[in-house]
Amino acid sequence: MEGPVTYLADPDRYSRMPYRRTGRSGLLLPAISLGLWNNFGGDRPYETSRAIVRRAFDLGITHFDLANNYGPPYGSAEETFGRLLATDLAPFRDELVVSTKAGYDMWPGPYGEWGSRKYVLASLDQSLRRLGLDYVDIFYSHRADPDTPLEETMGALDTAVRQGKALYAGISSYAPERTREAAAILDGLGTPLLIHQPSYSMFNRWIEDGLLDVLGELGVGCIGFSPLAQGLLTDRYSEGIPEGSRIARDLSLPADQLTEQTKAKVAGLREIANGRGQPLAAMALAWTLRDPRMTSTLVGASSVGQLEQNVRALDRLDFTVDELDAIDRYATESDINLWSESSDV
């Protein structure tokens, strides 16, 4: 049993965070949202996760992004957040946007991944049990399935909404034309596509080649993940590979990505950030929000201090033309789209 609720949310939490419309929908999301991918699993101290989430809400972050297999181990991030929803956040459910996803491997056998109706809807039921919720706000197809008809996967999202288990439907890492097709199918079913969640950073700009145009045309929101290129766009690797970092732990960022060319680009970007009076990470996050078609950017955090540093991006969101031109000299594709298998479908 959890102890009594002792958390008192900051009464000024909505005064510091800008909220942006999700496409043409009625839903507003904070400019910065919190992703619970690698830092909220069962391998992390619960009190650390608790402190980060509480501080996020105090800073005006109302959107918390999950997936069925976030951890490690799989499912444990949803369980951690479910504990918080049952205690500290219990009075605030209607002030929160909780999202989860299904698409990657979750359990053994042929029904434990991809985009079949059987897997997608079973996964959502499991997620709701772990979260202790009757519904999530946004339910995503986590990746494109090359072998399952798109009509089946989108039909499962529509069913989730019609059953009241999700309020909105989303997709993640879908190519531009497949996004257009998915939106058309959902429109035909009467459940509009709310949002797309692609990877997007200064070193991973694939969405600028057609996807943002499609989303703008369709009135679909966009929330970018991995905006700091798995930590490359921070000061973390300026002096080598620190213990406990993603590279050191072999988590999603291969050591061969930290090339001399990448280090030189990071150094150039850091100089521009210094000229703006911002840390590199803050500038990199602000840069992902420079396009009005971007609804929000997803940050991760392993500590309260790291979260607070990321939110400093809001101190200066504007860029001059000269700054953007200077950034473009260094912000070039760096072959770090680890999710291209889906976006190439």
Model-derived features: positions:
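Short, acidic/polar
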Residues: 43-57, 115-131, 179-183
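Phosphate/pyrophosphate-binding loops at sites that engage ATP/ADP/AMP, CoA/4′-phosphopantetheine
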Residues: 89, 125-134, 277
